[in-house]
Regions:
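Short, flexible helix/strand-to-coil boundary loops that buttress conserved ligand/catalytic motifs
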Residues: 21, 31, 60, 69, ...
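Hydrophobic-ligand binding "helix-grip"
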Residues: 28, 36, 43-101
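A conserved amphipathic terminal alpha-helix motif
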Residues: 99-135
């Protein structure tokens, strides 16, 4: 089993990033795929049209999300913790995922960087409401 941890800078305030990660319609906007999500502990979720499924464990509005991601019959839960920190450029999103099966690690690491984080970054960089004017 492996662990993944990385920080990503998202060009939006933590409150907005939190909503993008916890509101189904917003998830669908930035992923382009069907999503099921309720920001309530002990509820099931599905992202990217069932590519990622699991159970929500904990929420701290605007700051933290803890989920269990399912990997088939794996005996130990893979726990994902996302912490959102204020950053001069918006939000520092800290991602930590534990108990990743060795055979899935490269795909998971690539997915976090090239799909999950990149999708959020692109969503907010392209958002005219954010007023991304250069100073």
């Amino acid at each position: 089993m492996k662990e993944f941890k990385k920080y990503y800078i998202i060009p939006a305030p933590p409150e907005d990033v939190y909503k993008a990660l916890t509101v189904a319609i917003t998830l669908e906007l930035w992923t382009g795929e069907k999503a099921e999500m309720k920001a309530e502990p002990d509820t099931e979720f599905s992202l990217w049209d069932d590519s990622i499924v699991g159970r929500n464990l904990e929420f701290e509005e605007g700051k933290k999300i803890v989920q269990q991601w399912y990997f088939g019959d794996q005996p130990e839960a893979s726990i994902v913790t996302i912490k959102l920190h204020e950053h001069p450029q918006g939000t520092s999103m800290e991602v930590r995922q534990t108990n990743i099966p060795d055979v899935d690690y490269e795909d998971i690491a690539e997915g976090w960087t090239h799909s999950y984080a990149a999708g959020l970054i692109e969503f907010y960089e392209d958002d005219p409401a954010e007023g991304n004017s250069e100073s």
